[in-house]
């Protein structure tokens, strides 16, 4: 009897997740990035400036969990700031891209429309940086930072992919690919 109840529970547990997946609201990507950057007020104290380049139009959204995307952006931004020990420029960019089999960057994503959110820094890279930023011992806040593997896994959970590239003496660029959607625009009828 316990096996039947367990199987029955698992089936009921799966059904709501499928319906929630379909009803996931579209997240306007540019708005999300702008609100996220507004919350990064602590960067000025560290000598880090922020540059935004929002190429996506205002109707482009992503079909992923908003909180998960914000967590990914926070993890990638903190990682970038850790590379800029003496200050620098943190850049966030949104672009709508079409991935196909011949895509420039290697991802396991199916062909289709995606939003690429790029987070890059101008700091130098040190070989010990990956280990140093998982926990900052000297930090007054003792922030625990997610590893690059954890960020990649979170991107997969969001239905996307994370591709990072190091550039000698000029920082790192992380490209987060998320499934793109278009928000429906209701026409406004005005009388003249």
Language model features: what each stretch is:
Residues 159-166, 174:
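Glycine-rich ATP-binding loops of the HATPase_c
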Residues 120, 171-181:
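Short C-terminal beta-strand
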Residues 149-158:
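Detector for a conserved hydrophobic position within an alpha-helical segment of the HATPase_c
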């Amino acid at each position: 009897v316990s096996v039947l109840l367990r199987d029955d529970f698992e089936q009921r547990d799966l059904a709501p997740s499928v319906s929630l997946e379909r009803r996931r609201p579209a997240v306007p990507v540019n708005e999300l990035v702008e609100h996220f950057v507004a919350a990064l007020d602590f960067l000025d104290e560290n000598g880090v400036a922020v540059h935004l380049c929002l190429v996506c139009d205002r109707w482009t959204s992503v079909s992923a969990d908003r909180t998960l995307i914000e967590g990914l952006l926070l993890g990638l931004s903190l990682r970038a700031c850790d590379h800029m020990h003496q200050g620098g420029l943190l850049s966030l960019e949104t672009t709508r891209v079409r991935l196909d089999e011949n895509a420039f960057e290697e991802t396991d994503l199916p062909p289709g429309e995606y939003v690429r959110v790029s987070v890059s820094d101008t700091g130098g890279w040190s070989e010990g940086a990956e280990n140093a930023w998982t926990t900052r011992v000297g930090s007054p806040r003792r922030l625990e930072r997610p590893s690059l593997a954890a960020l990649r896994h979170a991107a997969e959970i969001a239905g996307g992919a994370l591709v990072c590239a190091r550039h000698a003496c000029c920082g790192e660029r992380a490209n987060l690919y998320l499934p793109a959607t278009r928000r429906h625009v209701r026409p406004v009828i005005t009388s003249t």
